[in-house]
């Protein structure tokens, strides 16, 4: 490898909202935040979980509840 042409490959922490912290290496920014990781994702845990992004489900139900009455 040539000297000085490659980006730095440094250790970073990926922090999940569930509290899980994953150590990895990257050429990108420092620490990262994610909403879902392998410790809390329904596919990996086998548990059904509803992810509500900024109340979108409630707004949808409120909007279309008028039509059902």
From Swiss-Prot:
One of its GO terms (cellular component) is ribosome. Keywords: Metal-binding, Ribonucleoprotein, Ribosomal protein, RNA-binding, rRNA-binding, Zinc. Zn(2+) binds at residues 16, 18, 37, 40. GO terms for biological process: translation. It comes from the Bacteria. InterPro entries: Ribosomal_bL28/bL31-like_sf, Ribosomal_bL31, Ribosomal_bL31_A, Ribosomal_bL31_sf. Its cofactor is Zn(2+). The keyword Ribosomal protein applies. It holds the Pfam family Ribosomal_L31. Binds 1 zinc ion per subunit. One of its GO terms (molecular function) is rRNA binding. The keyword Kinase does not apply. Part of the 50S ribosomal subunit. Binds the 23S rRNA. Belongs to the bacterial ribosomal protein bL31 family. Type A subfamily. This is Large ribosomal subunit protein bL31. It comes from Syntrophotalea carbinolica (strain DSM 2380 / NBRC 103641 / GraBd1). The gene is rpmE.
């Amino acid at each position: 490898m040539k000297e000085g042409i490659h980006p730095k490959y440094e250790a970073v922490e990926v922090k999940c909202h569930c509290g899980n912290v994953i150590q990895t290496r990257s050429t990108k920014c420092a620490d990262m935040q994610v909403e879902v990781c392998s410790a809390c994702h329904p596919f990996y845990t086998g548990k059904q979980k509803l992810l509500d992004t900024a109340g979108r489900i409630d707004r949808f139900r409120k909007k279309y509840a008028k039509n059902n009455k």
